[in-house]
């Protein structure tokens, strides 16, 4: 059994300005996406130039932040938004939804693709492998914040979160970091190393993330004000993830059939 380390969520205090670890994790994710994007842009099959990657990351970052924050409140905490609309601006408090961020990024990529006249699926295939490092960093931020804790567990690496009592729990944030961040990055980077049918990389991202997320939900506590939706185990995260898996598999099948046609 492990004890959760009491980590100060503020990484650096500069007078009245507090720099939070959670915010720094987003910076790490965006910088990683920018660096990897610049590297991928040197490939002969890249739909964007290295200079265009700068704008792509800016559009993507804007879509992630706006979509993730709005998505959290719309999917998980609509009453909280009505009671405190300014909570939308307090990014350091967490409360970011992946599914909302995905919608925001999709909209941002759509605008970018229209602006530069790039087929949307070519652009999303380029961008998908840039995302997992940011996802993993975000889950590390959740761990530092002491949020999104796991269900009670008796495994040797179970962790006690003092604010929740003495009951050991799964460190589900670290599970998500390992699967949605590290494993997904390795999978997508390997898969996209060779030219693939248009839409295949995007489809793999959607399907693989969906499977990883649905799996980890079995070890993660649902939001207290929502609870389980059915069967004593089904969570809202799993419900929102199912369309991703179906869309991802469908997109891969479509891409390969189109390639072989």
UniProtKB/Swiss-Prot annotation:
GO cellular component: plasma membrane
Main location, first listed in the record: membrane
Domain of life per record: Bacteria
Family matches, as InterPro entries: Lgt (IPR001640)
E.C. numbers: 2.5.1.145
Bilayer topology: Multi-pass membrane protein
Keyword Plastid: no
Pathway the protein acts in: Protein modification; lipoprotein biosynthesis (diacylglyceryl transfer)
Keyword Cytoplasm: no
Subcellular location: Cell inner membrane
GO MF terms, alphabetically ordered: phosphatidylglycerol-prolipoprotein diacylglyceryl transferase activity
This protein's UniProt keywords: Cell inner membrane, Cell membrane, Membrane, Transferase, Transmembrane, Transmembrane helix
One Pfam entry name: LGT
Function noted in UniProt: Catalyzes the transfer of the diacylglyceryl group from phosphatidylglycerol to the sulfhydryl group of the N-terminal cysteine of a prolipoprotein, the first step in the formation of mature lipoproteins.
Family: Belongs to the Lgt family.
UniProt protein name: Phosphatidylglycerol--prolipoprotein diacylglyceryl transferase
Native organism: Halorhodospira halophila (strain DSM 244 / SL1) (Ectothiorhodospira halophila (strain DSM 244 / SL1))
Gene name, Swiss-Prot/TrEMBL: lgt
